[in-house]
């Protein structure tokens, strides 16, 4: 089960090592998603990006 899927509660419990497969949860976008620009194979669905590099520092 994806700890970051929050379709039932609207929130999720994410640890520092959390790996999201479903990034629709707002509270997970900062702490869990590998945020990459379009075209990056590591980009998690639904991530909000502020940079163009393929690393975790590009997450807002």
From Swiss-Prot:
Record has Plastid as a keyword: no
Molecular-function GO terms, alphabetical: metal ion binding
Binding site for a divalent metal cation 1: 4, 6, 20, 23
Keywords, ordered alphabetically: Metal-binding, Metal-thiolate cluster
Family matches, as InterPro entries: Metalthion_dom_sf (IPR017854), Metalthion_dom_sf_vert (IPR023587), Metalthion_vert (IPR000006), Metalthion_vert_metal_BS (IPR018064)
Gene Ontology annotations of biological process type: angiogenesis; positive regulation of cell migration involved in sprouting angiogenesis; positive regulation of vascular endothelial growth factor production; response to cadmium ion; response to copper ion; response to methylmercury; response to zinc ion
Region described as Beta: 1-28
SUPFAM superfamilies, per the entry: Metallothionein
Binding-site residues for a divalent metal cation 5, renumbered to this chain: 33, 35-36, 49
Binding positions (a divalent metal cation 3): 14, 18, 23, 28
Binding site for a divalent metal cation 2: 6, 12, 14, 25
Superkingdom, natural source: Eukaryota
Binding site for a divalent metal cation 6: 36, 40, 43, 59
Location of region: Alpha: 29-60
Transmembrane parts of this sequence: none
PROSITE patterns: METALLOTHIONEIN_VRT
Ligand binding (a divalent metal cation 4): 32-33, 43, 47
Disulphide bonds in the chain: none
PANTHER family: METALLOTHIONEIN, METALLOTHIONEIN-1X
Entry similarity comment: Belongs to the metallothionein superfamily. Type 1 family.
Function according to Swiss-Prot or TrEMBL: Metallothioneins have a high content of cysteine residues that bind various heavy metals.
Domain notes: Class I metallothioneins contain 2 metal-binding domains: four divalent ions are chelated within cluster A of the alpha domain and are coordinated via cysteinyl thiolate bridges to 11 cysteine ligands. Cluster B, the corresponding region within the beta domain, can ligate three divalent ions to 9 cysteines.
Protein name: Metallothionein A
């Amino acid at each position: 089960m994806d700890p970051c899927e929050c379709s039932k509660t609207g929130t999720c419990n994410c640890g520092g090592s959390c790996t999201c497969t479903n990034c629709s949860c707002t509270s997970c976008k900062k702490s869990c998603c590998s945020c990459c620009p379009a075209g990056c194979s590591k980009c998690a669905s639904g991530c909000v990006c502020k940079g163009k590099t393929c690393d975790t520092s590009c997450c807002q």
